[in-house]
Amino acid sequence: MCVWLQPDTMKLQPYSKRVAVHTGGCTGWDPNEARMFSAPSIWGPWTQHPNPCRGEKSEITFGGQSTYVLPVPGKKDAFIFMADIWRPKHPSDARYIWLPIQFENGVPYIEWMDSWTLDFFDKKLPASSDN
């Protein structure tokens, strides 16, 4: 599954009768552009999508590397994108990014926000119209 891309790590996100994979390239500590694929099942067929990140520094995953997709308990198709910001010269000063995953035409995307709360998921649009 997507092995030819030499991904750093892969995070599965099941949503609305589909599954998405969030990943990035193997660049060590350096952030890079996020990649995303989706399929009707884990077995494919897989479709590659453009970089799912939007906003400032989206071309380098907001300065981080994806680490996990956290489902929001009690909310359908609600997920938090989690990423680490590593600082090689100061490893004890690692930072973290948590952003809500949003959907457009049934495809997940991650938009930079300076701040947000879990109330965001009470106002969001559904992952697809066939729920």
Locate predicted features:
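Carbohydrate-active catalytic/glycan-binding domains of CAZyme proteins
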Residues: 1-131
